[in-house]
Curated annotation (Swiss-Prot):
Similarity comment: family membership: Belongs to the polypeptide deformylase family.
Name of the molecule in the record: Peptide deformylase
Known function: Removes the formyl group from the N-terminal Met of newly synthesized proteins. Requires at least a dipeptide for an efficient rate of reaction. N-terminal L-methionine is a prerequisite for activity but the enzyme has broad specificity at other positions.
EC number(s) per entry: 3.5.1.88
Origin species: Pseudomonas aeruginosa (strain ATCC 15692 / DSM 22644 / CIP 104116 / JCM 14847 / LMG 12228 / 1C / PRS 101 / PAO1)
Gene, per the UniProt record: def
Length: 168
């Protein structure tokens, strides 16, 4: 397994729309393992392949406190099941150190493939619903900062650009 480099906003590669996975093979499963290792090391609760500069529709997440519930979503899709919205304070490994409130549908139906390529479907609420929507946004080239005002988004971009310059 390997720790992968996580792209950070405003890197334009984060805006790439991911392509569907055609075949779930050993290379895809190795990527999934590397993504889990990267996510746990960061640490985070979710990671989309786009964030590690692999533009395939793959998401990993683990919402447990003790890293005991790894979940894989290949070619995930979701549909809102209610018009009711929940507001969560979201953060992101690609926007380190920033947390902002984002409104999202509170209940969604998820369709995806598991790490063996088997299709599954489930209804999600709460944190799982928020996370799958957040990670699917990544696969579509969107970040949580896109839900913020232009002023807030620009302020975050400028702070991260300054940090990147100082680290260079």
């Amino acid at each position: 397994m390997a720790i992968l480099n996580i792209l950070e906003f405003p890197d334009p590669r984060l805006r790439t729309i991911a392509k569907p996975v055609e075949v779930v093979d050993d290379a895809v499963r190795q990527l999934i393992d590397d993504m889990f290792e990267t996510m746990y090391e960061a640490p985070g609760i979710g990671l989309a392949a786009t964030q590690v500069n692999v533009h395939k529709r793959i998401v990993v997440m683990d919402l447990s406190e003790d890293k005991s519930e790894p979940r894989v979503f290949i070619n995930p899709e979701f549909e809102p099941l209610t018009e009711d919205m929940d507001q969560y304070q979201e953060g992101c490994l690609s926007v380190p150190g920033f947390y902002e409130n984002v409104d999202r549908p509170q209940k969604v139906r998820i369709k995806a493939l598991d790490r063996d390529g088997n299709p599954f479907e489930e209804v999600a609420e709460g944190l799982l619903a928020v996370c799958i929507q957040h990670e699917c946004d990544h696969l579509n080239g969107k970040l949580f900062v896109d839900y913020l005002s232009t002023l807030k988004r620009d302020r975050i971009r400028k702070k991260l650009e300054k940090q990147h310059r100082q680290q260079a």
